Design a protein with these regions (language model features):
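Cytochrome P450
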Residues: 1-405
Length: 405
């Protein structure tokens, strides 16, 4: 495969996870380089080259479709029945029923319209209390899940909230880490917890829950209870904390590092409802890390030949900071738009795991809460930030002290 240079740092390194541009900026312009190599994997990180791979019908999202992996998966299916049950029943791992997909769109829109962050005000108000918040991430990581459950009229206590959040993280942490059986086991345990919670609620839903029309639509499509439980749990309870919670942590970090952007949003608060503004904050930093693509046919990219059967990882923090595509990539620029070719910062067309409308509605409320309470003296110190760098598909901040002044 073409030339992949060693950066001298692991892709799992905390500093590389937080500040990848510092390592990549010198090789964006090197024409003889296709990507970088780390931890036994090859990564593409330029915008145009990665976009060509994303939109190629011959590049499937997979760690490698070969006999070894098939045998490994067969063993996992026997040893980890909850994971196998989820994959068997969730349409996100197969062809979706288009009518049910449309019903999901209606459900997402309803939740986005009905969601209330009024009860979250005490969490946002902590930004006004002065002193130092040692780990505000703990406060905001489960907040989106809390709002989602309340909007769906699903009862929960603090234990449920923590279990659902950590279970979703366990599922996500196993993605792209197919050879790490410890993570597969964690995924299985997490999916068991999510399944148990959904089964305990599925037959006792509040009459006004927006889940009721979704379930009815599923029945009309011929889906059974197991498929509906797997799809609801798999799409939303495994993803909402990272898509909104973890990305909110990165957005907060970006705002605290870019005083001009922070002031602009405080002076023009209506901007937090603008999708392009939210997408620009996500372009600057979000939770997506690397997703693999297998080449089902040979492909040539800028003179580099990638052979059939080979696998590369698309490194999204690099794609989103490519200075040959994004002017002044380290700067937050609210004049950028994300239609047309600019729409791949998550992997394709405003795509997010929980749906574009729901993501935008939740993030708009999160950003608004930050801006209403952050004092002008607030700051962070990068050296104090801690990350869980062992994730392959995700970037995860685990601790970020905020000095409020």
């Amino acid at each position: 495969m073409g030339k992949f240079v060693d950066l001298g740092v692991s892709v799992f390194d905390a500093e590389f996870t937080l500040n990848p541009y510092d390592y990549l900026k010198e090789i964006y312009d090197r024409k003889e380089v296709l990507g970088f190599h780390s931890d036994g994997m090859n990564f593409m990180f330029r915008f145009e080259q990665s976009r060509a791979v994303i939109f190629s019908k011959n590049c499937t999202r997979a760690m490698g479709n070969n006999e070894e992996l098939q045998q490994l998966e067969e063993g996992y299916a026997k040893r980890y029945p909850n994971r196998a049950w989820h994959f068997r029943n969730s349409y996100t791992h197969g062809e979706p029923d288009l009518k049910f997909k449309a019903a999901i769109g209606r459900f997402v829109a309803q939740v986005a319209d009905q969601a209330s962050f009024f009860g979250a005000e005490p969490i946002f108000a902590k930004l006004s209390q002065g002193g130092t918040l040692d780990n505000y991430i703990d406060e905001i990581s489960t907040l989106p899940m809390r709002v989602f459950l309340e909007t769906c009229k699903l009862p929960y206590d603090n234990h449920d909230l923590e279990v659902l959040h950590t279970s979703g993280c366990a599922f996500l942490k196993s993605l792209e880490n197919f050879y790490d059986e410890e993570l597969i086991a964690g995924c299985d345990s997490g999916l068991a917890c999510i399944r148990d919670y959904m089964e305990s609620q599925f037959y006792n839903l509040d009459a006004e829950s927006p889940l009721r029309p979704l379930i009815s639509a599923g029945y009309n499509c011929g889906m059974n209870d197991e498929q509906l439980i797997a799809n609801i749990g798999g799409m939303f309870l495994t993803s909402i904390s990272n898509t909104v919670g973890i990305s909110s942590a990165f957005i907060l970090r970006s705002l605290l590092r870019d005083q001009a952007a922070w002031r602009t949003l405080q002076e023009q608060p209506e901007l937090v409802e603008n999708e392009d503004v939210i997408m620009e904050l996500l372009r600057r930093d979000n939770h997506v890390k690397a997703l693999s693509r297998q080449f089902d046919q040979s492909m040539e990219i800028d003179g580099f030949k990638i052979n059939s059967g080979e696998v590369v990882c698309l490194y999204f923090p690099g794609i989103n900071m490519d200075h040959n595509h994004w002017k002044k990539p380290t700067t937050i620029d609210f004049s950028r738009t994300f239609t047309g070719e600019n729409n791949i910062i998550f992997g394709g067309s405003f795509y997010t795991c929980i749906g574009r409308k729901l993501t935008m509605a939740f993030l708009s409320n999160m950003i608004d809460g930050f801006l209403r309470h952050l004092p002008a003296t607030a700051e962070i110190v990068d050296e104090e930030i801690e990350v869980d760098g062992s994730w392959m598909a995700e970037r995860m901040i685990t601790r970020m002290p905020i000095h409020l002044g």
